[in-house]
Curated annotation (Swiss-Prot):
Compartments in which it is found: Secreted
Record keyword Ubl conjugation present: no
Quaternary structure annotation from Swiss-Prot or TrEMBL: Monomer.
Entry's family note: Belongs to the long (4 C-C) scorpion toxin superfamily. Sodium channel inhibitor family. Alpha subfamily.
Domain notes for this protein: Has the structural arrangement of an alpha-helix connected to antiparallel beta-sheets by disulfide bonds (CS-alpha/beta).
Disulfide bonds: C12-C65, C16-C37, C23-C47, C27-C49
Keywords (A to Z) from UniProt: Amidation, Disulfide bond, Ion channel impairing toxin, Neurotoxin, Secreted, Toxin, Voltage-gated sodium channel impairing toxin
Name by which UniProt lists this protein: Alpha-like toxin Lqh3
Organism of origin: Leiurus hebraeus (Hebrew deathstalker scorpion)
Domain LCN-type CS-alpha/beta: from-to ranges: 2-66
GO cellular component: extracellular region
């Protein structure tokens, strides 16, 4: 397990609103313990997850979003 900004298949972040429960819900659905809306340089507001399973993608540094 690991912590990180949860990624969509194209190495794109899940955008969010500070203070909303959306990231916590998303992270728990994906097997993490919790989540919150954070700020990722180069991506903007993005969901951060705690204790995600290894089979759930997180943002790869240096890779662009390929949407």
């Amino acid at each position: 397990v690991r912590d990180g900004y949860i990624a969509q298949p194209e190495n794109c972040v899940y955008h969010c609103f500070p203070g909303s429960s959306g990231c916590d819900t998303l992270c728990k659905e994906k097997g993490g313990t919790s989540g919150h809306c954070g700020f990722k340089v180069g991506h903007g507001l993005a969901c951060w997850c705690n204790a995600l399973p290894d089979n759930v993608g997180i943002i790869v540094e240096g890779e662009k979003c390929h949407s």
